[in-house]
A protein has these predicted regions:
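N-terminal alpha-helical scaffold/docking segments in eukaryotic complex subunits
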Residues: 1-34, 47
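Eukaryotic acidic, Ser/Thr-rich intrinsically disordered low-complexity regions
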Residues: 112-141
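Amphipathic protein-protein interaction modules
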Residues: 74-102
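Short inter-helical turns and helix N-cap capping residues of alpha-solenoid HEAT/ARM repeat scaffolds
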Residues: 8-11, 43-44, 77-79, 123-124
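Conserved hydrophobic register position within alpha-solenoid helical repeats
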Residues: 18-21, 51, 86, 130-131, ...
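Residue-level detector of extended alpha-helical repeat arrays and alpha-solenoid scaffolds
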Residues: 11-15, 48, 83, 124-128
Length: 141
């Protein structure tokens, strides 16, 4: 995988340009460490949401990227719109793991348990609905 090309995330315009460029070039797989770093960066919702939408196209997700997307799904301090986008992204990534010949070290059953726990905890119906809609992908991932 390539080194992190995104530089200073406070200069979000430049980071967004690089995101759009690697999306167009279809090289997202090669930039997963940088994408995970953007997901850890809490000070720009546009970057986070863009990455969450773009990672759905990653064919061989790294454990670090899966973990960061799961962290957003689970984080009670993040607004629900981003968490719902993260649920969809996680479902796509888990589905892509099924077709990945390389075995990820991340425990997929642990992800399933965390997702199930969200369904029985108090959250808005729209969040539960997004989880249920995507749960088949988690269960089969």
């Amino acid at each position: 995988m390539s080194s992190d090309i995104f530089g200073n995330l406070m200069d979000w315009g430049q980071a967004m340009d690089k995101l759009n460029q690697i999306k167009q070039l279809k090289t997202l797989n090669e930039h997963q460490p940088g994408l995970a770093r953007i997901l850890r960066y809490r000070d720009n919702w546009r970057l986070r949401e863009t990455v969450l939408n773009y990672v759905k196209d990653i064919t061989h997700p790294s454990d670090d990227l899966l973990t960061e997307v799961l962290n957003i799904v689970m984080d009670e301090n993040i607004y629900y719109d981003a968490r719902i986008i993260a649920v969809d992204a996680l479902a796509s990534l888990m589905n892509n793991c099924k077709y990945n010949k390389e075995s990820n070290r991340i425990d997929k059953s642990d992800i399933n348990e965390k997702i199930k726990a969200l369904l029985v905890s108090p959250h808005p119906p729209i969040f539960h609905e997004a989880i249920r809609r995507s749960y088949q992908n988690f269960a089969n991932g």
